[in-house]
Amino acid sequence: MLNKDQFADNHFIRTIIEEDLESGKHTAVQTRFPPEPNGYLHIGHAKSICLNFGLAYIYDGLCNLRFDDTNPEKENDEYVNAIKEDVEWLGFHWAGEPRFASNYFDQLYDYAVGLIKDGKAYVDDLTPEEMREYRGTLTEAGKNSPYRDRSVEENLDLFTRMKNGEFPDGSKTLRLKIDMASGNINMRDPVIYRIRRAHHHNTGDKWCIYPMYDYTHCISDAIEGITHSLCTLEFEAHRPLYDCVLDNIPAPHATRPRQYEFSRLELLYTITSKRKLNQLVVEKHVSGWDDPRMPTISGMRRRGYTPEGLRLFAKRAGISKSENIVDMSVLEGAIREELENSAPRLMAVLNPLKVTLTNFETGRTQSRRAAFHPNHEEMGEREVPISQTIYIEADDFAENPPKGFKRLIPGGEVRLRHGYVIKCDEVVKDEAGNVVELKCSIDHDTLGKNPEGRKVKGVIHWVSAEHAAEIKVRLYDRLFTVERPDAVRGEDGEYLPFTDFLNPESVKEITAYAEPAAKDLPAESRWQFERIGYFVTDRKDHGKDTPVFNRTVTLKDSWQPK
């Protein structure tokens, strides 16, 4: 359930919106989230989703979902469907049906014809190499194309023939006629159409010319009546072109959109480049786009992150124009905080050590009811059985304990969570000297109460060996060992391959044992394994016969760079 407190506090975009509403410039807020369907959404997109949909929610406006699908070779329906699923999973709903820039191709073409008729666009025959040469540099003005002064009639004829498929791919472009000497390179006669014979996921083979992003985006905003078009800072230099296009076409809507920029999220210890994420998938460094180590929304969902936790992270990351570098611990902290409140508890033992309770009757089973959550009675209770043989964590026993060790030691006592106080009477070892079993006695008078005359400080978790569910546990950790894996230079000053910094210990699969309540859980069921961390049943591989749990995050931030 959304509420207005879940979104970023007052920031400069909210100030702009409130001033626009107060002045009457706009009577309602209309935003949009405009992904290109050429990959899966990642954590950076989650921030943008929360911003655009969140602002619409806060100010009782609307937010469109629009697919900027102008690159047919890279886009497909798989990505479209995945994006829609991710947005809905995050808790948001778009206004009306999803939009596609490709739905506006006819209008975009008509506007281009109008620009030609007004002498503001021309067909160019320069090759890409020649165009780069004519474009100039940041310190040197560009040169006019020799085709810049074609007549309106010739340009209309050539553009029509481009549309009809009479010319080879890449042989001609349509360019805006602006200023080749502009200090902003984006304003040096930018290309707005190119010839590209490619099947389009939405329009099929209807078109062999496709509009460019800078031309399409602003017109799509205008058609949809967007009031505040929000994008990341790398588009700041494109804003003059955004305004220029809209200044030179008939207004498609009474509302004129305005572009505003905010800083891109940079999350440490990961990457968000779609190209590099795709490389990880193609080269099989990960199992797919939804691998729980990936920063994709589908990967984080499979890892066990919650929509509420991601919205909390987006709020804490904030919105500004300054550099937005955020440590992974901030993301993990937000997830941990949300799960602390929402995840029911179970006990599980990841590294089992056998314990025989010598004074517990052989063949007898006793059980005690325990709450699923200490602060949420509504989550109910479960039966926790105990039998003569139990498993505890091997780390919860030490023959030669370090200072301050409060768990089980030879001759020492510890309380079993939800159970008795036990005392270690004997340590059993194998031929190699490894501890393989503890023989302990229970204090029968300590079930649910403290022992008389002594204080037992340590409390450990455990499971009944007879009743435990055998589970598969995947212990996930950070995918990379350095903060910026794609920004490390070698001795020669060149960037090193980001794959050099993959964490070889980013996943480890083990067999563990959990309370019997773990046997019949549905997929995507999130739990706290007491004293260990937060886990989720895998949404793909989990089943009744083969329970699979993914570690979402540890109870505390224990990351140490490798």
Curated annotation (Swiss-Prot):
Which SUPFAM superfamilies does the record cross-reference, listed alphabetically? Nucleotidylyl transferase, Ribosomal protein L25-like
This chain belongs to which protein, by name? Glutamine--tRNA ligase
**Aminoacyl-tRNA synthetase: present as a keyword of the record?**
yes
Q: Per the UniProt entry, what species is this protein from, by scientific name? A: Neisseria meningitidis serogroup B (strain ATCC BAA-335 / MC58)
In terms of InterPro entries, this protein maps to: Gln-tRNA-synth (IPR004514), Gln/Glu-tRNA_Ligase (IPR050132), Gln_tRNA_ligase_bac (IPR022861), Glu/Gln-tRNA-synth (IPR000924), Glu/Gln-tRNA-synth_Ib_cat-dom (IPR020058), Glu/Gln-tRNA-synth_Ib_codon-bd (IPR020059), Rbsml_bL25/Gln-tRNA_synth_N (IPR020056), Ribosomal_bL25/Gln-tRNA_synth (IPR011035)
Entries under PANTHER family matching the protein: GLUTAMATE--TRNA LIGASE, GLUTAMINE-TRNA LIGASE
For the motif 'KMSKS' region, what are the positions? 271-275
The chemistry this enzyme catalyses reads: tRNA(Gln) + L-glutamine + ATP = L-glutaminyl-tRNA(Gln) + AMP + diphosphate
- Gene giving rise to this polypeptide: glnS
